[in-house]
A protein has these predicted regions:
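N-terminal module-boundary/linker segments of secreted carbohydrate-active enzymes
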Residues: 2-10, 14
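Helical "lid/coupling" subdomains associated with nucleotide-phosphate turnover
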Residues: 7, 21, 43-85, 93, ...
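Conserved Rossmann-like nucleotide-cofactor binding loop
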Residues: 15, 169
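Hydrophobic pocket-lining residues within nucleotide cofactor-binding pockets
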Residues: 24
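Beta-strand initiation motifs
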Residues: 27-35, 126, 182
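Short coil-to-beta-strand
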Residues: 31-39, 88-92
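Calcium-coordinating acidic loop motifs
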Residues: 166
């Protein structure tokens, strides 16, 4: 069996940290396979927020982060031994998102220092210092993840996917618009190595499910019960969420300046929703995503590891279910979900925010992103066995960056899809194939700032 190279991407999010372990094979071509992923709660930001579940609360912030991450790295090492995957010396790329963006700079730096120390003390290799992802980079990785897993990185614009992602602290959108006008803040020009596409890729801080829910409740000045609290009222909740979103956009509170303009989605472009988009659909359809509407004409590239197409409801279909969901008490919602609460995306702590989440998705999609009521949004927990996370996009990006550093020319990325045969992405548009020896020469450690595969227009 050919030797495979191992690399780990850790998504240090606001609610928890998820590690993705990838392997690559073949001496001439890079093959990408996600061996497994694992999540640990709470997130690293809990060390600065002094949340009760954070380890070593009595210690300093850096020590808390080191202990938090050390537990995850220990579990990864054990998993590598159990699954007979060679992980000693594997590079670890830790990238933090909105949870750390929301912290004070000194707290953020302390957490990243503690994370770096944990990696150095493990059997893995620290070749790229932990850092906080700018929101635009997270959005770019979302786009790369979906289109790499679906096999459309080298496709014409009309065949690529627009990607919406909602975490706990922020929300992202990324797609290739029909016009690459610099007047739209957030336009990024990919390098020729990545096909030279002009993408719109932005993040809005504070529009993640957890942050938005807390903000919407804090703004309440009405009498009686807040309509977003279960049992609540969907129409009232949507109005409150809409007012919050409009105010944040007008005040420039999301990090994009005041009243940022969004380019229109190209007609016919398929939209994919990740993370809490999937959670919302699970909650809306009784914990079983297969009950939600889908579209038989949807591209097969979006199928999961066993070939099932994802649910793809329209906004009106979501709203019809949201009116029912928001009227539930928390106990009634749990009964409605029944045994389906075993789904890893249906965490108990999310359920009180389900009404807000559904309203937020509708408001953002309709009022900010311009999604029409006829457009279906395919919501995916995984695509061909790859977890629905920006981590795969980051891995593809790192590979392409290594190509730029070494001047290597490849013939494309082969995405190895468990149970599904590999698909070769057109090398003329995505020259990121690498010899494994080239990866070793690169050391897998070039910081992203050294080689930009995109530029801001």
């Amino acid at each position: 069996m050919a030797t495979r190279t191992t690399a780990i991407v850790i998504d240090a999010g606001s609610s928890g940290s998820r590690a993705h372990l990838y392997t690559f094979g073949a001496p001439q071509l890079t093959t990408i396979r996600e061996e497994w992923s694992m999540k640990r709660w709470p997130g690293l930001s809990a060390c600065a927020l002094k949340e009760p579940k954070a380890p070593s609360i009595e210690a300093n912030i850096s020590g808390c982060a080191r202990k938090n991450l050390s537990h995850m790295l220990h579990d990864l090492e054990a998993g590598c031994r159990t699954k007979s995957v060679h992980c000693v010396g594997a590079p670890v790329y830790l990238r933090a998102t909105a949870g750390l963006r929301l912290l004070q700079p000194q707290d953020r730096e302390s957490i990243l220092q503690g994370a770096a120390e944990a990696i150095r003390q493990s059997s893995f290799r620290l070749t790229s210092l932990p850092r906080t992802l700018p929101g635009s980079e997270e959005a770019l990785y979302d786009w790369l993840m979906v289109n790499a897993a679906a096999g459309t990185l080298g496709a014409p614009r009309s065949a690529t996917f627009a990607v919406l992602d909602m975490g706990g602290g922020s929300t992202q959108i990324a797609f290739e618009p029909a016009s690459a006008s610099p007047s739209f803040q957030g336009m990024q020009q990919l390098s020729s190595q990545m096909g030279g596409r002009a993408l719109y890729a932005v993040s809005r801080l504070g529009f993640g499910m957890n942050e938005a829910h807390d903000s919407v409740l804090a703004r309440w000045r009405g009498a009686g019960r807040h309509p977003c609290k279960l049992p609540g009222d969907y129409e009232g909740c949507r109005k409150e969420v809409s007012a919050f979103v409009r105010a944040a956009e007008e005040e420039g509170a999301t990090g994009l300046g005041r009243q940022p303009r969004t380019p229109p989605l190209p007609p016919g472009m398929q939209v994919v929703g990740l993370d809490n988009f999937y959670f919302a659909v699970l909650a809306l359809w009784g914990g079983d995503a297969s009950r939600a509407p889908t579209d038989a004409a949807m591209p097969a590239g979006l199928a999961d590891a066993v070939g099932r197409l994802p649910p793809a409801p329209t906004l009106p279909e979501m709203e019809a279910r949201a009116r029912r969901l928001c009227a539930f008490s928390e106990d009634a919602l749990k009964l409605d979900l029944g045994g389906h609460t075993r789904d890893k995306k249906l965490k108990a702590e999310k359920l009180p925010k389900a009404c807000t989440c559904a309203a937020l998705i509708v408001v953002l999609a309709r009022e900010v992103y311009g999604v029409t009521d006829e457009q279906r949004i395919a919501v995916a927990a995984d695509i061909h066995g790859f977890d629905g996370s920006w981590a795969l996009g980051a891995m593809v990006y790192e590979i392409a960056e290594g190509t730029g550093q070494n001047g290597l020319v490849g013939v494309g990325v082969i995405i190895v899809r468990p149970i599904v045969r590999p698909i070769i992405v057109a090398g003329a548009l995505l020259l990121v194939g690498l010899a494994v020896s080239g990866l070793r020469r690169a050391g897998w450690g070039w910081p992203l700032s050294n080689v930009r595969l995109y530029s801001v227009l």
